[in-house]
Amino acid sequence: MDTKKAIVLGADNNYRDKLETTIKSICYHNRDLKFYIFNEDIPKEWFYLMEKRLEKLNCEILNIEIDAEKVKHFSTPDEHIKYMTYFRYFIAEFVKEDRALYLDCDMVVHGNIDPLFQKDFEENYIIAVPDGWYKNIFNAGMMMVNVHKWKTDNICQNLLELTAEKHQEVYGDQGVLNLLFENKWKKVSPHYNFMVGLDTLGYWAQKPEWFLNSWDENYKPAIIHFEGKDKPWNDSLKTRYRELWWFYNGLDWQTILLEKDSKPTSFSEIATVNLFHTAIFTDTQELEHIEYLVEKLPNVHFHIFAHSYFGPRVQVLNRFLNVSLYPNYTPYQSQEMLSKLDFYLDINHNREIDNIISKVHDLSKPIFAFENTSHDTNNRSQILQKNQTKW
């Protein structure tokens, strides 16, 4: 018997590229799937294209049109969260299988999800991961749903009624789901809903557990969740695993069909990337000859860090493809950068930031500076001449 694993995703037509990125990531690592796409306005032509692509993976896709009028009047806790988030209430109304994996479309799957489908519900309504901020509740971005129990207990209607009563008092549908399923959900490892995206907030709120496992470069979560407003497809560079999202987004379907050992595994394999990396840590817009250096060194990527927002003279550098700006950076971002640093540019005026010169010397990486910008009190940096033309 050909049994496929049920996956439920919800989106509108404006979010279709994010939806497809999530599907690509799932199919990169998994086969034999049945996708239920909850929506109200995605064109049928997209489904025709997806059917053709997915059939080669022994997968299928269903267009599930939801009557949005049933949920449009419910409030959402933030402007980036739309009423489509309530579509997950209808899972048991349409899914034929006894269990289904629900995923938000700001997630990518980075491994095999078979173990999730093998977990015992133990009479619970869902299997989920505790929220990154409040451990006594679950994050609703990933839910393994006990569809059979939802149907038996008329969960869809119960959720709609409870939402009508409580939607302005709790955190959207996640708040309602936690009310209804209090003490009726089973915990699973954050490996299956590894939450990023609120990194700056986590740092300033002094919650080091938010970065749990991020320091271990060998840790590879199976599902990554880009929570909050700092999505990887936005211009902000605050989000961990940003390149991973763009890797799955950039994959073509022919590549996904390849055998495992033949597939690319990183963003650098499918995109043009710079050969070398340098960094500047600053608290001022005064960066000596920065634009000249950026233009003369096209194979070098310039990573500029500050504890505040950037002024216009630095912000304008964002037009260069080999420049990345990190306002209000976190320790995780700086450590990640230093791990791939080739050399450091000590070209900011004013004071040294975060004892960066000593940190770079400890890494045995070269430091280049101008005579009027050097912060190296031990005179180990290489001093550049202002009229120097070879770099």
How does the language model describe each region?
Residues 1-14, 18-21, 147-275:
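A glycosyltransferase accessory/donor-loop signature
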Residues 366-370:
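Short hydrophobic beta-strand element within catalytic cores of glycosyltransferases
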Residues 37, 271-316:
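Conserved catalytic-core segment of nucleotide-activated headgroup transferases in glycan assembly
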Residues 339-352:
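Acidic donor-binding loop of glycosyltransferase active sites
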Residues 100:
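Short aromatic/hydrophobic "clamp" motif used to bind/position activated sugar donors
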Residues 107-136:
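Conserved donor-nucleotide/metal-binding helix-loop-beta segment in metal-dependent transferases, i.e.
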Residues 45-48, 52-93:
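Active-site-proximal specificity loops/subdomain of glycosyltransferases
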Residues 307-310, 323-337, 353:
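Conserved active-site histidine-acidic residue motif and adjacent donor-binding/catalytic loop
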